[in-house]
């Protein structure tokens, strides 16, 4: 360009080379669409939620899972940690996962239950020789060996681990999923300085987006709920403030509606505002069986407050 030509002598050859490396890559919209298709997605093992998400949890994006305690956020994360390892012959990613646990919620026995159920399912549906061969190595031991667990006791440890993560990902190219359960806990419990917390969260959000796009992995973060007063009434909203709400590409709200557990997609660039029923079983995150005459398993969100 003219600017580069003008300053060539001042920059020198080495400086010019570095500058050119930093220039943005120009791609067409069609190329971007093709890249997204190639990235793939991770099944949630809920066909209704997968359908609402246009195929499952997107790779290369940041997804936030919000909800009150006990509604199933961690259970969905554990399910995804197993599902990301589904063999390629079944349409899976055959990847590995990094699970950053800030609350001590990772329970090995529960992971074992979910893994055993997934292995049983694919053993039953395996048809051709390639799929049957894949099941020879897709077992409990291989699933557990592909989960890298990182226990973070405070926000300093969490930020430090994320700082080291790019080097780890270069050494482990099969990692396709990063889970942080939860991102809210260390910041809300241990950091009272709101100004500092906001700056750190902004930096963290940028870092997660960079990790997702540069390393082509799905980033899943869980968030707690807090109370906000609006029109003299209190409402439950995702924690960490409105600025944090821009961190994710997709936001899924898990909530109770009476006796029903509902997963609502409240933010997404491509999915309609939809809610589907789910429940947590001994085998993991699953659909709720719909009545036989039900042709519409998804529940339109007719009223939705801005989250």
Task: Name these PLM-found stretches.
Residues 1-5, 9-25, 32, 269-271, ...:
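Intrinsically disordered, low-complexity glycine/charged-rich regulatory or linker segments
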Residues 67, 101, 151, 182, ...:
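Flexible glycine-/small-residue-rich
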Residues 3, 11-133:
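The Walker A/P-loop phosphate-binding site
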Residues 63, 98-100, 148-150, 220, ...:
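Hydrophobic/aromatic beta-strand patches that form the interior of the parallel beta-sheet core
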Residues 198-202, 206-307:
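Phosphate-binding/switch region of NTP-binding enzymes
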Residues 46, 50, 59, 74-75, ...:
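Amphipathic alpha-helical transducer elements in NTP-driven molecular machines
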Residues 92-195:
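Conserved inter-motif catalytic segment of the P-loop NTP-binding fold
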Residues 22, 52-56, 68, 83-91, ...:
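Conserved, well-folded catalytic cores of nucleic-acid-processing
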């Amino acid at each position: 360009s003219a600017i580069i030509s003008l300053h060539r002598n001042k920059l020198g050859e080495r400086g010019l080379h570095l500058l050119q490396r930093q220039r943005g890559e120009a791609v067409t919209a069609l190329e971007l669409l093709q890249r997204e298709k190639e990235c793939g997605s991770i099944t949630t093992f809920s066909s209704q939620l997968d359908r609402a998400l246009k195929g499952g949890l997107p790779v290369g994006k940041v997804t936030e899972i919000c909800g009150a305690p006990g509604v199933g956020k961690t259970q969905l994360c554990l399910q995804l940690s197993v599902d990301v390892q589904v063999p390629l012959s079944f349409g899976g990613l055959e990847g590995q996962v990094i699970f950053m646990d800030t609350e001590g919620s990772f329970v090995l026995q529960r992971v074992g239950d979910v893994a055993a159920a997934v292995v049983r399912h694919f053993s039953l549906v395996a048809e051709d020789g390639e799929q049957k061969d894949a099941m020879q190595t897709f077992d409990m031991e291989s699933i557990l060996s592909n989960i890298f667990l990182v226990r973070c006791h405070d926000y300093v440890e969490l930020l430090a681990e994320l700082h080291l993560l790019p080097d780890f990902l270069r050494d482990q190219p099969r990692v396709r999923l990063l889970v942080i359960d939860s991102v809210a806990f260390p910041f809300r419990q241990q950091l009272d300085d709101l100004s500092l917390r906001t700056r750190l969260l902004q930096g963290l959000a940028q870092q997660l987006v960079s990790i997702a796009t540069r390393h082509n992995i799905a980033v899943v973060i869980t968030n707690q709920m807090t109370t906000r007063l609006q029109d003299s009434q209190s409402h439950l909203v995702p924690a960490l403030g409105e600025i944090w709400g821009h961190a994710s590409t997709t936001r899924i709200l898990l909530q109770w509606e009476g006796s029903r557990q509902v997963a609502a997609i409240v933010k997404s660039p491509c999915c309609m505002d939809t809610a589907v029923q789910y429940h947590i079983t001994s085998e993991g995150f699953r659909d709720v069986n719909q009545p036989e005459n039900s042709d519409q398993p998804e529940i339109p969100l007719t009223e939705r407050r801005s989250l």
